[in-house]
UniProtKB/Swiss-Prot annotation:
GO terms for biological process: cellular response to starvation; gluconeogenesis. This is Transcription activator of gluconeogenesis ARB_05058. Keywords: Activator, DNA-binding, Gluconeogenesis, Metal-binding, Nucleus, Transcription, Transcription regulation, Zinc. Residues 1-34, 133-213, 267-277, 287-300, 361-379, 640-661 have a biased composition (Polar residues). It comes from Arthroderma benhamiae (strain ATCC MYA-4681 / CBS 112371) (Trichophyton mentagrophytes). GO terms for molecular function: DNA-binding transcription factor activity, RNA polymerase II-specific; RNA polymerase II transcription regulatory region sequence-specific DNA binding; zinc ion binding. The keyword Nucleus applies. Belongs to the ERT1/acuK family. Residues 40-55 have a biased composition (Basic and acidic residues).
Length: 721
């Protein structure tokens, strides 16, 4: 039998194996199809569920319950939540407690609950306080525990001015309880046997008792008498603020209450809405129901009768020693040196400011609490009718703004846009340079005039090149830029205490500070050309100009009789003073040499050096000083002449020390104030100074103005004996 031949049994085996393999492949294929169908169906159901619009969206809960919070599970706003219901914990489901901030450690957990939880907590405490108050003995004093105010017909008798000296001292707001004073006003003790004769006529007199817990008064809450932490006191809707806790919402609302409407409402509105206290212990609180009324017409008087804070600027000073008793010397600092201020509306006792010696006190108007006679005089005052008592004027924030409280110079009401409307013509710099040239030729010697002329001639081509392409509109715009920049600089000059002066590129004074006028004696009106210039001090060897010149005859350029006139003829001029008139000869030459380098050089460069400023002296003042010095030198000996000179110069030499170079160095206290600055340069008419100046350019890159800051060196040369 050949190897390729098979038996029948082998053929049967091969057939069976082929059928098994085919069945196995069919089974595997069917399993794959079933798995694929299941996966497809699952994906379809998932996609259908994801796109189902009727599926409720999961809402983020404001606060999880305690069980879900510990298990880090998703919770809902409803109580009990769904998870606690499924687990059978619905009876123990309550809001979880969050970690408190540091400033809330002293707050109870119930008060930090969101929504109405804090209100319920306050009501439960109120019920407990009522229950405790109803158990008091009849002879015990009663307490008013309402944070809000109810009608005066239901309020008990309250003696606002006790007669006992000890009680007065206890109720007085002294300096010892400023640091530890609570923002919540203390409860007022009311005795049943208290007489109503000591009541102020402005206080309502009623004989009704305090409402009990069983019969509460309308709008009554059981807390402190004047509790600023009560949101109903300022119409705070804590639920609408969407805060997580009561204290955060109250703080936010109080800040908004303090920041809105400051100084915009008259005292009849602001004082009545927020509660005000007068200096005689009376005030007004406008209320409707249990909260403050926003409308002044709906306000009803509650407990106090005066509206608004009295004028504390016109009240006689209070005797602080009698007010605080024998401990008046222990008060730190002098209260009269501190600014006047009012405390923010936190409590009635806090209306008195600890920094004011005339601030209104809660107890009385101006009564002294140390002497018994004063107390008796105050008692007799209560019997005087209200119409005969002196009415204190009412002051409001707008009125305080109009009063002169020595707050310094205010910002002017000038509008910057008015500059662009007022400037119609360009400024004539050519005439200014002609006037400067005439002044230099008249004052300085030929050698010094030549040095100044060389410095100006070096920058003259640059001026011509930059201005030859400018038309009239460009020159007007240049002047508008100058005036706008000067308008901005005037605020800086008034704000800083450094002697400052601003001038044009011609050297004409355009702005000057008050300190510069005090230092040099030049009035602002004279420097700006608004008043005639009668100065005769040119810084010569004698320090004075007698009216004749050593240059011989000279006729200045006939520019204008009003703009420039020789000071030898004593004719007033209306042109602004040149910067060269404020400096001595050497300082003027040095200035123009530095100006030639800086005018078209470094745009942000500056020059810092020393100079001598000339004091403003008229001919009459110079003659008096010269005559006094001549008489002292001729008729007196050396010691008498020295004493006469010291008397003439005032306190010029008091306490001053001299060095080996014949100069007097001033002490810090000797030149303090305006009087000390006026003494500088009294003898020779010169003030030794160091100054720093810079050049500001306009949009055409042309020097526009010169800003100069001056500082005194406190060195005064001694006159020769």
């Amino acid at each position: 039998m050949s190897p390729h031949q098979t038996t029948g049994q082998e053929s049967d085996n091969m057939t069976v194996n082929g059928e098994n393999a085919q069945a196995s492949s069919q089974y595997i294929q069917s399993n794959e199809e079933m798995t694929s169908a299941i996966a497809t169906e699952k994906k379809a159901s998932t996609a259908k569920a994801a796109k189902d619009p009727s599926r409720p969206k999961r809402k983020k809960a404001k606060r999880a319950c305690y069980a879900c919070q510990r298990g880090h599970l998703t919770c809902g706003d409803e109580r009990p939540c769904q998870r606690c219901i499924k687990r059978g914990f619905q009876d123990a489901c309550h809001d979880g407690v969050r970690k408190k901030a540091k400033y809330l450690h002293d707050a109870p957990n119930e008060a930090l609950m969101a929504g109405v939880g804090a209100t319920l907590y306050n009501q439960r405490n109120a019920a407990q306080n009522n229950a405790n108050g109803s158990n008091t003995s009849p002879g015990a004093p009663q307490q008013i525990t309402s944070p809000n105010f109810y009608n005066t017909q239901q309020s008990p008798d309250y003696n606002g001015f006790p007669q006992n000296k000890t009680e007065l001292q206890d109720s007085t707001v002294g300096p010892d309880n400023y640091a530890s004073q609570s923002p919540v006003s203390p409860t007022y003790q009311i005795s049943q046997g208290l007489s109503t004769q000591g009541l102020s006529p402005s206080l309502p007199q009623s004989t009704s008792e305090t409402p009990s817990a069983a019969n509460p008064a309308p709008g009554q809450f059981n807390s402190a008498f004047f509790d600023p932490s009560d949101p109903a006191l300022f119409n705070f809707d804590l639920a609408s603020m969407n805060f997580g806790n009561h204290y955060g919402a109250l703080e936010f609302g109080m800040l908004g209450h303090m920041a809105t409407g400051v100084g915009d409402t008259p005292p009849s509105e602001s004082g009545a809405q927020r509660g005000s206290i007068g200096q005689n212990g009376s005030g007004t609180f406008g209320l409707t129901g249990s909260n403050f009324s926003e409308s002044p017409s709906n306000q009803a008087p509650y407990l106090f009768s005066e509206s608004g804070m009295n004028d504390w600027t016109q009240t006689a000073p209070v005797n602080r020693r009698s007010m605080y008793g024998s401990n008046a010397n222990l008060v730190a600092g002098n209260m009269s040196d501190k600014p006047h201020a009012f405390a923010i509306e936190s409590a009635p006792a806090n209306f008195a400011s600890p920094a004011s010696n005339e601030s209104p006190m809660m107890t009385t108007s101006s009564a002294t609490f140390e002497d018994t006679t004063n107390s008796g005089a105050f008692n007799s005052r209560q019997n005087v009718p209200v119409s005969q008592q002196r009415q204190q004027p009412v002051v409001s924030t707008p009125q305080l703004k109009q009063q002169n409280l020595n707050l310094g110079s205010r910002r002017r009401h000038k509008n910057a846009s008015s500059i662009y409307d007022s400037v119609k013509d360009p400024y004539s710099y050519t005439s200014g340079f002609h006037s400067l040239t005439a002044f230099i030729q008249r004052r300085f010697s030929p050698q010094k005039t030549l040095r100044i002329a060389k410095a100006l001639a070096s920058i003259r081509p640059s001026f011509i090149a930059t201005t030859k392409t400018l038309n009239r509109d460009d020159l007007i715009f240049m002047e508008k830029c100058f005036q706008r920049t000067l308008w901005e600089y005037e605020d800086f000059i008034n704000a800083c205490g450094t002697p400052t002066i601003v001038c044009r590129r011609t050297g004409e004074i355009a702005a000057v500070g008050k300190e510069f006028s005090i230092l040099t004696g030049w009035k602002k009106e004279v420097l700006l050309g608004k008043e005639p210039n009668h100065n005769v001090n040119t810084g010569g060897s004698s320090g004075l100009m007698t009216g004749s010149t050593s240059r011989g005859s000279y006729t200045p350029r006939p520019y204008s009789s009003e703009v420039y006139n020789s000071s030898a003829t004593a004719t007033p001029r209306t042109q602004p003073v040149f910067l060269a008139e404020l400096l001595d000869d050497d300082s003027v030459i040095e200035f123009y040499e530095d100006f030639a380098k800086l005018a078209f050089g470094d745009s942000r460069g500056s020059v810092m050096t020393t100079c001598k400023l000339l004091k403003y002296k008229t001919k009459a003042e110079s003659d008096i000083l010269a005559g006094s010095n001549g008489e002292a030198d001729a008729g007196l000996n050396g010691e008498a002449a020295s004493n006469e000179t010291n008397e003439l110069n005032g306190s010029l030499t008091n306490g001053a020390t001299t060095n080996g170079r014949g100069q007097r160095r001033w002490g810090k206290g000797e030149i303090a104030g305006e009087a000390g600055m006026n003494q500088l340069g009294f003898r020779d008419g010169k003030v030794e100074c160091s100054y720093c100046w810079t050049v500001k350019r306009d949009v055409f890159d042309i020097p526009m103005l010169i800003v100069m800051n001056v500082s005194c060196l406190c060195l005064e040369p001694l006159s020769e004996p």
